[in-house]
Amino acid sequence: MRERGADLLNRSADVRALDDAHPAYDRILSELAPDEARILRLFANSGPQAAVDVRTWRPLDVGAQTVAPGLTMIGPRAGVRYIDRVPAYLNNLFRLGLIWFSHDPLDDLPAYQVLEAQPDVLGAMRSAGRARIVRRSILLTPFGTDFCALCLPATTAGFEAVAAEAAAAST
Protein backbone atom coordinates (compact mmCIF):
# COMPACT_ATOMS: atom_id res chain seq x y z
CA MET A 1 0.00 0.00 0.00
CA ARG A 2 2.82 2.37 0.82
CA GLU A 3 4.32 1.77 -2.65
CA ARG A 4 1.03 2.62 -4.32
CA GLY A 5 0.79 5.80 -2.25
CA ALA A 6 4.35 6.75 -3.17
CA ASP A 7 3.56 6.08 -6.84
CA LEU A 8 0.54 8.41 -6.64
CA LEU A 9 2.64 11.17 -5.11
CA ASN A 10 5.34 10.71 -7.76
CA ARG A 11 2.76 10.90 -10.54
CA SER A 12 1.25 14.02 -8.98
CA ALA A 13 4.66 15.70 -9.14
CA ASP A 14 5.00 15.02 -12.88
CA VAL A 15 3.85 18.27 -14.51
CA ARG A 16 3.97 16.70 -17.99
CA ALA A 17 1.42 13.98 -17.19
CA LEU A 18 -2.06 14.59 -18.53
CA ASP A 19 -4.95 13.11 -16.58
CA ASP A 20 -8.08 14.09 -18.46
CA ALA A 21 -10.44 12.00 -16.35
CA HIS A 22 -10.64 10.95 -12.74
CA PRO A 23 -9.46 7.34 -12.39
CA ALA A 24 -12.78 6.35 -10.77
CA TYR A 25 -14.78 7.22 -13.91
CA ASP A 26 -14.05 3.88 -15.56
CA ARG A 27 -15.29 1.95 -12.52
CA ILE A 28 -18.32 4.24 -12.18
CA LEU A 29 -19.34 3.57 -15.79
CA SER A 30 -19.31 -0.15 -15.05
CA GLU A 31 -21.58 0.40 -12.02
CA LEU A 32 -24.30 2.36 -13.84
CA ALA A 33 -27.52 1.04 -15.32
CA PRO A 34 -28.55 2.45 -18.72
CA ASP A 35 -31.49 4.24 -17.05
CA GLU A 36 -29.04 5.89 -14.64
CA ALA A 37 -27.13 7.30 -17.61
CA ARG A 38 -30.40 8.81 -18.86
CA ILE A 39 -31.02 10.35 -15.43
CA LEU A 40 -27.52 11.84 -15.39
CA ARG A 41 -28.04 13.26 -18.86
CA LEU A 42 -31.30 14.87 -17.65
CA PHE A 43 -29.41 16.55 -14.79
CA ALA A 44 -26.59 17.64 -17.11
CA ASN A 45 -28.97 19.10 -19.71
CA SER A 46 -31.79 20.43 -17.50
CA GLY A 47 -30.14 21.19 -14.16
CA PRO A 48 -31.44 20.45 -10.65
CA GLN A 49 -34.75 18.61 -10.36
CA ALA A 50 -37.68 19.17 -8.01
CA ALA A 51 -38.49 16.62 -5.30
CA VAL A 52 -41.11 16.62 -2.56
CA ASP A 53 -41.76 14.74 0.65
CA VAL A 54 -45.37 14.30 1.78
CA ARG A 55 -45.68 14.48 5.57
CA THR A 56 -48.56 14.38 7.98
CA TRP A 57 -49.37 17.81 9.37
CA ARG A 58 -49.12 18.31 13.11
CA PRO A 59 -48.90 21.53 15.14
CA LEU A 60 -45.24 22.51 15.53
CA ASP A 61 -44.41 19.36 13.52
CA VAL A 62 -44.47 17.31 16.76
CA GLY A 63 -45.35 13.72 15.86
CA ALA A 64 -45.44 14.41 12.11
CA GLN A 65 -44.42 11.48 9.92
CA THR A 66 -43.14 11.25 6.38
CA VAL A 67 -45.74 9.40 4.32
CA ALA A 68 -43.97 9.51 0.94
CA PRO A 69 -40.34 10.70 0.70
CA GLY A 70 -38.51 11.86 -2.41
CA LEU A 71 -41.32 11.99 -4.97
CA THR A 72 -40.07 13.30 -8.32
CA MET A 73 -40.77 13.37 -12.03
CA ILE A 74 -37.19 12.40 -12.84
CA GLY A 75 -38.14 9.00 -14.30
CA PRO A 76 -40.62 10.26 -16.89
CA ARG A 77 -38.54 13.35 -17.69
CA ALA A 78 -35.42 11.24 -18.26
CA GLY A 79 -37.33 8.63 -20.27
CA VAL A 80 -36.22 5.71 -18.13
CA ARG A 81 -37.40 2.23 -18.98
CA TYR A 82 -38.09 1.08 -15.41
CA ILE A 83 -39.92 3.88 -13.58
CA ASP A 84 -40.30 1.82 -10.39
CA ARG A 85 -36.51 1.61 -10.06
CA VAL A 86 -35.94 5.38 -9.99
CA PRO A 87 -35.50 5.55 -6.17
CA ALA A 88 -32.85 2.80 -6.37
CA TYR A 89 -31.19 4.56 -9.31
CA LEU A 90 -31.03 7.83 -7.36
CA ASN A 91 -29.59 6.05 -4.33
CA ASN A 92 -26.88 4.48 -6.49
CA LEU A 93 -26.01 7.82 -8.10
CA PHE A 94 -25.75 9.33 -4.60
CA ARG A 95 -23.57 6.41 -3.45
CA LEU A 96 -21.22 7.06 -6.37
CA GLY A 97 -20.97 10.76 -5.44
CA LEU A 98 -22.63 11.97 -8.64
CA ILE A 99 -25.79 13.57 -7.20
CA TRP A 100 -26.78 15.34 -4.00
CA PHE A 101 -30.16 15.36 -2.22
CA SER A 102 -30.59 18.96 -1.09
CA HIS A 103 -32.97 20.23 1.57
CA ASP A 104 -33.22 23.50 -0.37
CA PRO A 105 -36.07 23.97 -2.83
CA LEU A 106 -35.61 25.22 -6.37
CA ASP A 107 -36.70 28.73 -7.31
CA ASP A 108 -38.83 27.12 -10.06
CA LEU A 109 -42.40 27.24 -8.66
CA PRO A 110 -44.02 25.73 -11.81
CA ALA A 111 -41.84 22.61 -11.46
CA TYR A 112 -43.32 22.01 -8.01
CA GLN A 113 -46.86 22.81 -9.14
CA VAL A 114 -46.64 20.16 -11.86
CA LEU A 115 -45.03 17.65 -9.48
CA GLU A 116 -47.63 18.24 -6.76
CA ALA A 117 -50.43 17.55 -9.27
CA GLN A 118 -49.11 14.05 -10.06
CA PRO A 119 -51.24 11.04 -9.01
CA ASP A 120 -48.62 9.58 -6.64
CA VAL A 121 -48.27 12.89 -4.78
CA LEU A 122 -52.04 13.39 -4.61
CA GLY A 123 -52.49 9.81 -3.37
CA ALA A 124 -49.88 10.30 -0.66
CA MET A 125 -51.59 13.52 0.40
CA ARG A 126 -54.93 11.72 0.70
CA SER A 127 -53.39 8.92 2.76
CA ALA A 128 -51.73 11.46 5.07
CA GLY A 129 -55.02 13.10 5.96
CA ARG A 130 -53.90 16.62 6.78
CA ALA A 131 -50.78 16.71 4.63
CA ARG A 132 -47.83 19.02 4.39
CA ILE A 133 -45.50 19.07 1.40
CA VAL A 134 -41.80 19.66 1.93
CA ARG A 135 -40.08 20.91 -1.23
CA ARG A 136 -36.55 19.74 -1.89
CA SER A 137 -34.21 19.39 -4.86
CA ILE A 138 -31.77 16.90 -6.37
CA LEU A 139 -28.71 18.09 -8.26
CA LEU A 140 -25.39 17.01 -9.70
CA THR A 141 -22.33 17.33 -7.50
CA PRO A 142 -19.27 19.03 -9.03
CA PHE A 143 -17.84 15.50 -9.42
CA GLY A 144 -21.06 14.46 -11.20
CA THR A 145 -20.94 17.50 -13.46
CA ASP A 146 -17.38 16.66 -14.51
CA PHE A 147 -18.31 12.99 -14.96
CA CYS A 148 -21.23 13.89 -17.25
CA ALA A 149 -19.14 16.33 -19.29
CA LEU A 150 -16.39 13.77 -19.88
CA CYS A 151 -18.29 10.49 -20.07
CA LEU A 152 -21.82 11.08 -21.38
CA PRO A 153 -22.80 12.59 -24.73
CA ALA A 154 -25.15 15.57 -24.45
CA THR A 155 -27.51 13.89 -26.91
CA THR A 156 -27.88 10.43 -28.32
CA ALA A 157 -29.31 11.40 -31.69
CA GLY A 158 -26.97 8.95 -33.43
CA PHE A 159 -28.00 6.10 -31.17
CA GLU A 160 -31.69 6.97 -31.52
CA ALA A 161 -31.38 7.02 -35.32
CA VAL A 162 -29.83 3.54 -35.26
CA ALA A 163 -32.64 2.30 -32.99
CA ALA A 164 -35.26 3.80 -35.32
CA GLU A 165 -33.64 2.11 -38.33
CA ALA A 166 -33.55 -1.22 -36.50
CA ALA A 167 -37.22 -0.87 -35.55
CA ALA A 168 -38.18 0.01 -39.13
CA ALA A 169 -36.18 -2.93 -40.50
CA SER A 170 -37.92 -5.40 -38.18
CA THR A 171 -41.41 -4.41 -39.38
Show which residues each predicted segment covers.
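Short, hydrophobic/aromatic alpha-helical segments in well-folded domains
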Residues: A24-I28, Y89, F143
